[in-house]
Amino acid sequence: MRSCAPRSSIRLFQGNSLPWGGLMPKGDEVMEVRKLKTVIAGCGKIFPMHAVPVSRDPHAVLTAVCDVKPERAGAAAERFGCRAYTDFEVMLEQEKPDVVHICTPHYLHAPLACLAMERGCHVLTEKPMAIALADARRMLDTAAATGRTLGVIFQNRYNAGSQLIRRCLDNGDLGEVRAARVLLTWDRSPEYYSQSDWKGTWDKEGGGVIIDQAIHTLDLMRWFIGRPVTGVQASLANRTHPDIPVEDTAEGRVEFEGGAYGAFYVMNHYCT
């Protein structure tokens, strides 16, 4: 385990609200509020997208990172001035964090999230929430049983255009949404899948273009329509990636409560 001294300090706030929603005494009374101890599991490509904002957040302190590759964990810890671990459970025991960010391969999201919540931590995990419906339900059940907050990254909801559409829908400016259509054309080379042993697999990634690329756009469709999904019909195909078993093309129809529906065609072998 690599050890570096983490930065930690006390922040003072005035007023009656805390940045994460807690309440303070009204008036000018000042009380001490400690920073949220934060750790990150997984130091791969998406890691900096979590570590950088956490390190800049005045209400949080990054105390540790964890990765199964010691050299990667060590490099991340040195960059952000925190401790490095290769064992997730040991990190939880030693650090006793308030918040855990999960940036691991997909199949690890559910077990790590549940373990962290059972240890009293709030969790923010990268998408997808899980690779199986039963695992996603277990995560929700664990959050409810422990009283911890569970968050899943769907950053496209916060794009300026997405926020504008959501406001227009909430205000009734666009009327009732009865149908939506998704067309997604990405390009993923064979090298994208060969760079790791979990990409392009059913048991570790959980699928192909739907769970990895189209998940964001399909999430926006459901968010804009704003109703529960009642049915899905879809067909999957692999047209240009013979070395992987998962789909690179999918099309289908999503039915929503109240009669609205969405159609989608997605691929990650777009020719440019």
Q: Where in this protein do the model-derived segments appear?
A:
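Rossmann-fold dehydrogenase core element
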Residues: 137-156, 175-179
